[in-house]
From Swiss-Prot:
Protein name (Swiss-Prot/TrEMBL): Alanine--tRNA ligase
UniProt free text on domains: Consists of three domains; the N-terminal catalytic domain, the editing domain and the C-terminal C-Ala domain. The editing domain removes incorrectly charged amino acids, while the C-Ala domain, along with tRNA(Ala), serves as a bridge to cooperatively bring together the editing and aminoacylation centers thus stimulating deacylation of misacylated tRNAs.
HAMAP family, alphabetized: Ala_tRNA_synth_B
Gene: alaS
Record carries keyword Heme: no
Binding site for Zn(2+): H563, H567, C665, H669
Keyword Protein biosynthesis (UniProt): yes
Subcellular location per the Swiss-Prot or TrEMBL entry: Cytoplasm
The species this protein was found in: Thermoanaerobacter pseudethanolicus (strain ATCC 33223 / 39E)
GO molecular function: alanine-tRNA ligase activity; aminoacyl-tRNA deacylase activity; ATP binding; catalytic activity, acting on a protein; transferase activity; tRNA binding; zinc ion binding
Family assignment from sequence similarity: Belongs to the class-II aminoacyl-tRNA synthetase family.
Enzyme class label: ligase
Gene Ontology cellular component annotations, sorted alphabetically: cytosol
Sorted UniProt keywords: Aminoacyl-tRNA synthetase, ATP-binding, Cytoplasm, Ligase, Metal-binding, Nucleotide-binding, Protein biosynthesis, RNA-binding, tRNA-binding, Zinc
Length: 877
């Protein structure tokens, strides 16, 4: 058989199924769209789920894709085995109620034997033990001998997750030869050894499983197949590991050059090389798809991969930041198949380098502390690290728990994960959000039971429509009618209401006829159904009733102003900050807009001014807004901006602002930029690593904001008795005066503290040659008490000091001791702990310095008497 590279196999697969009437779709983003059950896309089928469930209409009944995927459950095994990886590509052909087994099986066989040229005598298949139909097709139509068709049980050859669509599967195996086997007489398809490699899974979704566990035949069964590109490449190239495949090996070699080590010479170093090679691929595509490092959700997965790869770089002796350089190799090897990473290369490298530098600042210190923990545990003969210590490594040094666990595992130590979790909750630190898949992958919500009900949206052209009620949902149940006071969700056949999407809020308004008035507060979309959410103000509404649907026109126009302004802002950001800027999220409301975007540092005052001026310049130029429908490919070729996180059909809506801006967008817009009136930025802030946020106002909201600012300016001018232009210099002058006064006050405090210290020294008692000062001081906080204690220590040279103060709510205690006194047995941590207990509080610290508070300030004197007793006792012992 011919040796084929990954890029060749990918293209051959997609071209083959195109020849069978399939629509080739580009890989979807790793960020799932409208799917809370998934953190990241982890299979070829995952982004197509809405088509399988009927929530959305597929662009074709036959589809083929090569989908990039991320899976991290086996992250600890990556690099240690030949097959495990977190990033992979899944080839697939799919049928949505079109063809079934009679086509899917022969096509699969045709591809592997005729296109790939795999030898027939080395191919085996497995089927579900009760699937006689699949057996007949493999045997009679394909011509595979019965002995090469292995029947297997539900665990191996039946696909189901919770309830919903499911069905038997058939898998194709490649026999790598006896020399790769385990040598057991029972060795065959399904054996755990490396001889028989499963590389293509054909799933026949022909049943629907109900909550009672019963299976019902689907009227229109589906086909869902998946073939791991890396795995079939190992077969085609005759190699044992995915890390020896051409494209992936190219990245490994690049890392080897940086590390100055040769791959294949040292088992431990090879593990690190493979970890880096795997992780940098996922890192590159995650950042390209708009994910940024953070401490939760997808961002946490990315940070975890980055820091794990960085640590393995350190194990290879690479002490400088280097991962950002490896991005070049990923782009070189994958850019042909995924040209978007070529365009985003500089941005990806910048984010990787920033995160590397952030981790580099703390990793050495963190590793030293972790090694100390390991040494302590070994001395103590223990094998479990306290959860609080693992948390400290995470909180202070940025070590994800998994990284700590992995390093400890190498030393035969585990982590008290329960204790770690408790620390997270106690400290109110947001932990990584490992969203688990729902019991049902298919999200059988109320709206998915409505069959072919669809809503026609007419809101681009009109603000009202005569509509029919198709369904009413009340208390999460479908009902035939609802009455005044009920909160309802209503689906209409036709609507002018814009449903929340693309960052733009849903319309509000009313539904009414002579019998009913419903105040609609929001409108959302589930598949092709528009859900009008509101409250019945009067009357009764029933399914099939006719109503007039009217939106709040003022609210819609304000949202349109903000949406068009958002497009102008996006373009202005790219022009002024650079092409690396990509939209990462937005909110288009009727009273404001918010825009999140990728940028590696705070936007300067001067840049913000330029951005605001650029947007207003385009508003005043009265640019026309043109809206057209085009094919996705046409729009992108013409330069339309598409968002990473959106999923587009074959036909797209293009919003073009003359020759200035062009984006794919389903939102509502003004007809001319002069309708926006004015654009005003009100804030710029960070929302994550490499992620910034601008909030802005337009139209009357912006004018009102400026009027409020003007009023504040006038009040300041009146108070300062200064002209507007003089306000800043007047404030600076006052600040200088205050600074001088503060210095004078500070000097007076020092003098007073010195006088007070002399007074306290005069009242000090002597115990075994040690001066002991125990006293209450009025109107001092803990910092002032510590400063006074330092003066006393300096003056007395050999001293034990306990000072207290109080407010109506609490008592404050500070204990201090000189080094020689500590050597004589004084421990202020123990003294303050007991003293605070007397006044119903808590405290503690080091032998030479401790502090605490008490809830009962009336017991300060009693507590101080206790302090003298404890000091005496400590000196005796």
């Amino acid at each position: 058989m011919e040796k084929l590279g990954m890029n060749e196999i990918r293209e051959k697969f997609l071209s083959f199924f195109e020849s069978k009437g399939h629509l080739r779709l580009p890989s979807f983003s790793l960020i799932p769209k409208n799917d809370k059950s998934l953190l990241l896309i982890n299979s070829g089928m995952a982004p197509l789920k809405p088509y399988f469930t009927g929530k959305e209409t597929p662009p074709s009944k036959r589809v083929t894709t090569c989908q990039r995927c991320i899976r991290t459950p086996d992250i600890e095994r990556v690099g240690k085995t030949a097959r495990h990886g977190t990033f992979f590509e899944m080839l697939g052909n799919f049928s949505f109620g079109d063809y079934f087994k009679k086509e899917a099986i022969p096509w699969a066989w045709e591809f592997v034997t005729e296109v790939l040229g795999l030898p027939v005598n080395r191919l085996w298949v497995s089927i579900y033990e009760e699937d006689d139909e699949a057996f007949e097709i493999w045997n009679k139509i394909v011509g595979l001998p019965p002995e090469r068709i292995v029947r297997m049980g539900k665990e191996d050859n039946f696909w189901e997750i919770g309830t919903g669509p499911c069905g038997p599967s058939s898998e194709i195996y490649f026999d790598r030869g006896e020399e790769k086997g385990c040598g057991k007489p029972t060795c065959g398809v399904g054996c755990d050894c490396d001889r028989f490699i499963e590389f293509w899974n054909l799933v026949f979704t022909q049943f629907n499983k109900d909550e009672q566990g019963n299976y019902h035949r689907l009227p229109n069964p589906n086909i869902d197949t998946g073939m791991g590109l890396e795995r079939i490449a190992t077969i085609m190239q005759g190699v044992d590991s995915i890390f020896d495949v051409d494209v992936i090996r190219g990245i490994t070699n690049f890392v080897s050059q940086i590390a100055e080590v040769e791959y294949g010479k040292d088992a431990e170093k090879d593990v690190s090389l493979r970890v880096i090679t795997d992780h940098i691929r996922g890192i590159t595509f995650m950042i390209s798809d708009g994910i940024l490092p953070s401490n939760e959700g997808r961002g946490y997965v990315l940070r975890r991969l980055l820091r794990r790869a960085a640590r393995h770089g350190k194990l290879l002796g690479i002490n400088d930041t280097f991962l950002y350089r490896v991005v070049d190799s990923v782009v070189e090897n994958y850019g042909e198949a995924y040209p978007e990473i070529i365009d985003r290369k500089d941005y990806i490298k910048r984010i990787v380098k920033l995160e590397e530098e952030r981790f580099k600042e703390t990793i050495d210190q963190g590793l030293t502390i972790l090694q100390d923990y390991i040494n302590e545990l070994k001395v103590q003969g223990k094998t479990v690290l306290e959860g609080s210590k693992a948390f400290k490594l995470y909180d202070t040094y940025g070590f994800p728990l998994d990284l700590t666990k992995e390093i400890l595992q190498e030393a035969g130590i585990t982590v008290d994960e329960e204790g770690y979790t408790k620390e997270l909750e106690k400290q109110r630190i947001r932990a990584r959000s490992s969203r688990k898949e729902d019991n049902s992958l298919w999200e059988q919500d109320i709206y998915s039971t409505l069959g072919d009900i669809k809503t026609k949206f007419v809101g681009y052209d009109t603000y009202e429509s005569n509509s029919k009620v198709l369904a009413i949902v009340k208390d999460e149940e479908l009902v035939e009618e609802a009455e005044a006071g009920d909160d309802v969700s209503i689906i209409l056949d036709v609507t002018p209401f814009y449903a929340e999407s693309g960052g733009q809020i849903g319309d509000n308004g009313i539904l009414e006829n002579e019998n009913v008035l419903i105040k609609v507060k929001d409108c959302k979309k589930v598949g092709d159904r528009f859900i009008h959410i509101g409250t019945i103000e009067r009357g009764l509404i029933s399914v099939r009733d006719e109503v007039k649907a009217q939106i709040d026109v003022v609210s819609r126009r304000n949202a349109a102003r903000n949406h068009t302004a958002t497009h102008l802002l996006h373009k202005a950001l790219k022009e002024i900050l650079g092409d690396h800027v990509h939209q990462a999220g937005s909110l288009v409301a009727d009273d404001r807009l918010r825009f999140d975007f990728s940028h590696y540092q705070a936007v300067t005052k001067e840049e913000l001014k330029q951005i605001e001026n650029r947007v207003n310049e385009k508003i005043y130029q009265s640019l026309n807004v043109h809206i057209e429908e085009k094919t996705y490919d046409e729009a992108v070729k013409e330069g339309a901006v598409a968002l990473f996180t959106e999923k587009y059909g074959d036909k797209v809506r293009v919003v073009k602002i003359d020759d200035y801006s062009m984006e794919l967008c389903g939102g509502t817009h003004v007809k001319n930029t002069n309708e926006i009136g004015i654009f005003k930025i009100v804030s710029e802030s960070a929302v994550g690593a490499g992620l910034r946020r601008i909030e802005a106002l337009t139209g009357l909201a912006a004018i009102k904001y400026l009027e409020e600012k003007e009023e504040i300016l006038k009040e300041a001018s009146d108070l300062l008795k200064a002209q507007d232009k003089e306000i800043v210099s007047k404030i600076e002058s006052l600040q200088q005066v205050l600074k001088t006064k503060d210095k004078e006050i500070e000097q007076l405090k020092i003098k007073m503290a010195s006088i007070l210290a002399n007074s306290l020294i005069n009242s000090a008692i002597s115990l075994d040659g040690i001066k002991v000062v125990v006293s209450k001081v009025e109107d001092y906080d803990s910092e002032a008490l510590k400063a006074l204690g330092d003066i006393l220590k300096d003056k007395l040279k050999t001293a034990a000091i306990v000072l207290a103060s109080s407010t109506p709510e609490k008592a404050i205690f500070v204990g201090m001791a000189t080094k020689d006194v500590v050597q004589k047995g004084i421990n202020m941590g123990a003294v303050i702990k007991e003293v605070c207990k007397v006044s119903e509080g808590n405290g503690g610290g080091r032998p030479d310095m401790a502090q605490g508070t008490g809830k009962n300030p009336s017991k300060v004197e009693e507590a101080l008497n206790k302090a003298i007793d404890i000091v005496k006792e400590q000196l005796k012992n």
